[in-house]
Amino acid sequence: MLPTKISTLDIHQYVQSWVDEQPSWHLVTVAEDTDASFVNITVSDTEPTAANAQRLPFTQAQVFRYLLVPVTDTLMHPGKKTAAAHIIDDQLTTRLRHDLTEAYNDSHQASSTERLDIVDCHILSVGHMLRTHKLACFDMDSTLIEQEVIVELAKTAGIGEEVEAITEAAMRGEMDFDESFAQRVALLKGISTDVLDDICSRLTLSMGARTTISALKALGYHTVLVSGGFTYFARYIAEQLGVDEVHANALDIDEGEVTGHVQLPIVNGAKKAAIVEHTAERLGIEMSQVVCIGDGANDLPMMAIADLGVAYHAKPIVQARADAAINVTGLEGIFYALGYPALAPTE
């Protein structure tokens, strides 16, 4: 959504003015029908929210595409492409977001309850846009679903404070991920499978998740859920979405109750990356054809080895190291990062 008083011409002039101030960049016109860059996306998401509220059945976006070419090839040397992308993102996108938001507030006198969601900036090389990706690997918690399952388990079991204390200790560096994970799982001992089933029923898919998986599969992608969470929930979500395969931690369950243990090895960040690599090798897919999407620090290893690592409404450290960041749209924003002009409606 853009302020009504900001036209297509304004955007073109704005980008050109930024380029005029940058001695390192040229703006190249690659298509004459620039007005056709306005795109409507129809997202057929019908899953209910946690409050059983009706979700809007579509996301509308206005897309502007420009080819920025460096004056010299220095910026595009291997190892510097991400830095070049962040120059554009930090300077052009940040300023554009600020100015457009200010214009919107001035023209609409927006109240404090109104919010203008604009500008996700994806920097793509021409070679990247022409590349055919075949494997898409997703994190689960806060990516394919809106919740963090361990938090939901802790709330239900009444051990929220204990779990939080372990998490904070890990963040202070007092224990590694595997140790903190094992301690949190131990606190789940005695929880019945009835409780697990109840939590499954309350999990909500992220906006655009159903359409994104459906569209990727229609495009020929093999889809994988790679989670540091639990298979009990990951398999349920994968079934809801039609994801091809699942990798997560298997909770030990005995006589209908959680034992407080998981089967080793624990799926941590390094294991996630290994799973992605082994899956690609098994399917005969090059790593240059792999896309990984996540939100947490434990997703960074798999994002780093993929051709495209996408941060989805992620922590700052993840956004800073990702190839692309989605902050405005639902998961369907992945298709912009992949270079698709629009996401066609799906049933």
Regions found by a protein language model. Name each.
Residues H12, G190, V195-E347:
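C-terminal cap/substrate-recognition subdomain and adjoining C-terminal extension
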Residues Y14, Q91, R95, D99, ...:
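Exposed alpha-helical structural elements
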Residues W18, D99, A103, T156, ...:
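Residues that form generic nucleotide/phosphate-binding pockets
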Residues T59-Q62, L67, G127-R131, M140-L251, ...:
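Alpha-helical substrate-recognition element adjacent to the catalytic core
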Residues K134-A136, E168, V290:
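Residue-level marker of motif borders
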